């Protein structure tokens, strides 16, 4: 049985203190600005940071000693993944050499918007300098259009281009449902009553190694679509309190390299 570590719920005061101790008070201050309303779905500016979400993402990566992150979308989460992987890199860069991980302490960001990708990239570079991170995680940025498609006769979306990697942590927070090209029989996600429906994870499922974690930020309909169409054995938690859907691959170990990888996570 493959298990993962779930971060404990913390109150707002604890989380604010956590970020302040990381010299990230600016994120705490920005998080208190106004957030968009439920029907304000097409935004011209980047979202303000959500402290609770960011704290939990940081802890998921740290507690489970992730090595390679694939992020659908970009934003403040990209910065947090960078900080978490950079911390793990300092602690485990030598030990990782014994594993079959060819992109250790690297992040692959897949974004539809050149504008928001540039914002995320500049933000990460700014904080790397501000926090004097000498050897940060390596980040690969890929811009790709998204189109409507069919998977098992279900209408959904797919990216036209995906970066080559095999992550052990996948964060699903993109694309924006309005950044999708064409339609299928007149249907697309470009309507406020529709919802995101990414299919790319399903197409890559058989490449993932046991122990791989997927976190969906909200996107409950997309999480259900994944759950109903996965072929391998995935454990699933619907975390309503934090509006997250967590999957991890609890499949039979593939061989000695996968076994060593799982042992690294648990030590």
Task: Name what the model sees in each region.
Residues 142, 153, 175-267:
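C-terminal substrate-binding/active-site "lid" region of AdoMet-derived donor-dependent transferases
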Residues 66-75:
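Conserved class I S-adenosyl-L-methionine
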Residues 117-166:
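S-adenosyl-L-methionine
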Residues 1-22:
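N-terminal auxiliary segments of SAM/dcSAM-dependent transferases
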Residues 66, 165-168:
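Local beta-strand N-terminus motif with an aromatic residue
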Residues 89, 103-105, 209-212:
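A short helix->loop->beta-strand "cap" motif at the edges of active sites that frequently abuts
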Residues 18-65, 79:
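Class I SAM-dependent methyltransferase Rossmann-like catalytic core
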């Amino acid at each position: 049985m493959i298990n993962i570590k779930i971060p404990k719920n913390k109150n707002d005061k604890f989380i604010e203190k956590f970020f302040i101790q990381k010299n990230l008070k600016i994120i705490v201050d920005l998080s208190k600005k106004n957030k968009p309303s439920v029907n304000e779905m097409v935004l011209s500016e980047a979202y303000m940071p959500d402290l609770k979400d960011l704290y939990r993402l940081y802890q998921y990566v740290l507690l489970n000693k992730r090595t390679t992150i694939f992020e659908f979308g970009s934003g403040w989460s990209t910065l947090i993944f960078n900080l978490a992987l950079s911390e793990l890199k300092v602690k485990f860069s030598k030990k990782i050499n014994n594993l079959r991980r060819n992109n250790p302490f690297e992040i692959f960001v897949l974004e539809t918007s050149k504008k928001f990708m540039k914002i995320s990239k500049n933000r990460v570079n700014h904080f790397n300098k501000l926090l004097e991170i000498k050897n940060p995680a390596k980040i690969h940025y890929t811009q790709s259009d998204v189109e409507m498609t069919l998977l098992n006769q279900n209408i959904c979306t797919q990216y036209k281009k995906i970066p080559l990697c095999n992550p052990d942590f996948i964060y699903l927070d993109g694309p924006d449902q309005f950044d999708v090209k064409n339609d299928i029989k007149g249907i697309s996600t470009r309507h406020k009553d529709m919802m995101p429906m990414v299919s790319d994870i399903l197409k890559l499922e058989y490449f993932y190694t046991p122990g791989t974690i997927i976190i969906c930020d909200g996107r409950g309909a997309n999480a259900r679509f994944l759950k109903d169409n996965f072929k391998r054995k995935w454990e699933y938690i619907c975390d309503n309190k934090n509006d997250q859907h967590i999957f991890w691959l609890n499949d039979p170990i593939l061989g000695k390299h996968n076994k060593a990888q799982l042992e690294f996570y648990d030590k």
